Amino acid sequence: MSIKLKTVILECGDIPQLVSFYTSLLHWPVVYEIETFVGIHSNEDEMGIAFQYDENYVPPTWPAKLGQQQMMAHLDFAVEDKSALKEAVENATILGAKIADEQYGGEEWITMLDPAGHPFCFVVWNH
């Protein structure tokens, strides 16, 4: 038996906002869409991200603070080198992401927040 991760689902209060952000950032097409759930997948169809509507969505606090909404997961996106890292951060910022105030990864790992407040990272990943 073979099991592989296919899709990560992000809760949100504004699906179109996140679909626009991630399809523009990753150039992945929408592959499934209903009113309360939209999925996008890599062009190789290896991995996907889906956005599920939650009318009570509260953005996570990052880094975590006692008594605040906790992050349940975050996404790491690999880039080839520091130049690609800089370009990815600039592009994500133009698309509506924010660089997180707290950074722990040095020059090769940048934490950002998408337009709905989900943390994600760009990482110079050589393996």
Q: What residue spans do the PLM features occupy?
A:
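Short acidic/glycine-enriched loop/turn segments that link adjacent beta-strands
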Residues: I34-F37, G105-E108
